[in-house]
Amino acid sequence: MILLRYILLCLVILSGTEIRAQLSEISGLVTDANGKPIAGAFLIIRPNEKMIQTGVDGRYQFKNIPAGNHQLTCFATGKQLLNFNFNCQGSAITHNFQLNELAANLNAVEINQAREDDFGISRLRAVHDFAIYEGKKSEVIQLNDTKANLATNNPRQVYSKVTGLNIWESDGAGLQLGIGGRGLNPNRTASFNVRQNGYDISADALGYPESYYTPPTEALESIEIVRGAASLQYGTQFGGLLNFRFKRGPFHRKAELTSRQTIGSWGFFNSFNSLGGTTSNGRLNYYGFFQFKRGDGYRVNSGFEQVNAFASITYDLSAKWKLQVDITKMKYLAQQAGGLTDKTFEQDPRQSFRSRNWFMVDWNLASVQLSHKFNPNTELNIRSFGLMAGRSSVGNLERINVADLGGNRTLIEGKFENIGNETRLIHRYKIGKQLQVLATGIRIYKGNTRARQGFGSSGSDANFNYITPGEPENSDYQFPSTNLAAFAEHIFRVSDRFSITPGLRAEYIQTASTGYYKSYVFDAAGNIVTQSRADEDISRERQFLLAGVGLSYKSPRNLEVYANFSQNYRAINFSDLRIVNPNFVVDPNIRDEEGYTADLGLRGKIKSSFQYELTVFYVAYRGKIGQILKTGQPPLFSNIRYRSNIADARNIGVESFFEWQVLKSDSAGRKPALNLFCNTAFVDARYINTDDKSILNRFVEMVPRFIFRTGADLRFRKWNLHGMYAYTGEHFSDATNAVLTATAVEGLIPAYQVVDLGIGFTHKWLNIQFNVNNALNEQYFTRRSESYPGPGILPADGRAFYCTLQFKL
């Protein structure tokens, strides 16, 4: 017994010696650009999540650091944010930081205290990812802190704190995202320049900017949104920029496995599994995931199955060169229940009158980014990207008030191939004592889309083969496109608090269409009387210059006042050229849209418990593309939706957001934390300057005049409880503001309100989350569709329950 105690005592002493031997320390000095010590600078070490501040002499010291990889982040108010990766092996390390006056790195500091201060949403700093955001309205959703239902990509919850968004909710599985801001159409988020990790992911950035692929929010670190002022650096869209920022592997571990398994109503199942880490020398970081998702859907005939995979490697080639490679694969098949009329929706929103409609998407993306740091003031980024993708839809496109009696279905196929490069340069220099920043770059983009439409099979299965594949019955087109662009923006810092940021973007666009379309004349019985074929070979070039300017004033009381003006441009879509659809007709003389966006806003924080933002905006269109009702051709003379440049338009609005940290927990979590937020938008969007008196001064379609979202998040120890209320005002689906039509393609979209609830429990490596979407079982719809996945009313999901089990090893 004495011998056993002696052995145990020796083991304890030896283990303690080993632990002490592995502990390290790091210390150093933090100075400004002139070498003057900075007192009160913040330093955060991860994964310990410990934060300290420098003393009056600018020095810092961390002790008792365990062995392994660590990251040290240093920042100060109004100064640069820097990261230092290091490996501890029991020795003392010295590292000094020199912080410039303008931040160049905007990656969020992912620690609990910082997330509490940011409330789950933050703003982009002046310079981020080789672009300038000074004087622009921006929002960053921090996904690490959100309580949204991530398994379903629920946009109502994920984007609840982003102001002024109209959200389509007809896709309860999160396969496609449909959001539009400030009166812009939410259709597949086409009003935004949509990217992931800074590169394009849409079908065709010029002629078909629709997003059939949506990155899973479970894999994201953040979502960055910049309003119309992003047109100078990222593209010409009126909506601005939407960028999905993927997670990276943890810096402090060689491998970390995260697995999330979710089950829910209507046979929903989602399995998300990711692996990431950093090699022992700290030079190679990797992250990847695989996702499988399936469900039967809220409505009859609305089942789906999806697979999604992603891999990313970041390698430090040297102290100045960094390489990042991304690969993405996504594929899904979904049955589409079709639309409903107003009457059938009131009877039962879950019913379906289309059992033969299917939709398939196959998306493949690749990107290579190379960054070079010439010196602390000059950096270069070269990002190349490519897409090979396709979408196919087969089904009955007839109006929903016409029964499906069988026969050949309409098959529409799109194949997308594009490649591009963006090269960006950031340069910092001083004029007097003020640091100035220049961001400049070029873009080269080449795309090709093949669009075909013809007769598919007469069955009910997911058969995407043409009856005559060599010559489809409706159309077969190639749409090549070329885009060359150059931009420059410059922050002129007049003083410590006031800056002016002008910018220019020069664009060259060449689009072409080569192919044929066929026209048919039918008798009263639906038989073909005559048919004709027209071949086309059209090319078009455009060159133009966009300009903008931003102003920013930062008061000493943590308040910023900003103003921005930027020109915008939107090219017509390929789908506006040759798509045969019995529900709408496109004007053959349709042309591009032009206009501008203007912002005036203020934002800030009161202490660390209250943040707010108030913005007034004006969006102007010249020749806005819209849809009006017209009388169709004989013999039926049915109303049709006619798509053309119907009028000029202007959108005026006010957006406000605030969040209040009512209760703030301590570092140990022994006190409860309570956050409240409120998101409000008033928008008045009308058609002006038009010869068509039927739409003069009418409301622009798909623009709710009032949007309100509010929520609360309560955390105590290992538990969190959250709830959200969302209200969207009534709006119209066409420019004539029709209230009710027989086809249900046009009509009023009534106001609706939705309540979501959730509760979660976290213990070390385990997390359990329960969500109730649409807790009050509101029966509503957000969309009337003229084509797939309709036509007609597309109901939103009713009450649904979800349970997620997550573990991290």
Regions found by a protein language model. Give the residues of each.
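Face-selective signature of the C-terminal outer-membrane beta-barrel domain
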Residues: 319-330, 361-520, 554, 613-616, ...
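Short strand-turn segments of transmembrane beta-barrel domains in outer membranes
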Residues: 222, 229-231, 241-278, 290, ...
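Extracytoplasmic beta-strand/coil segments of soluble accessory domains associated
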Residues: 130-135, 139-141, 147-203
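Membrane-embedded beta-barrel scaffold of Gram-negative outer-membrane proteins
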Residues: 371-373, 379-395, 554, 560-566, ...
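C-terminal beta-signal and adjacent terminal beta-strands/loops
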Residues: 622-623, 673-674, 727-739, 760-809
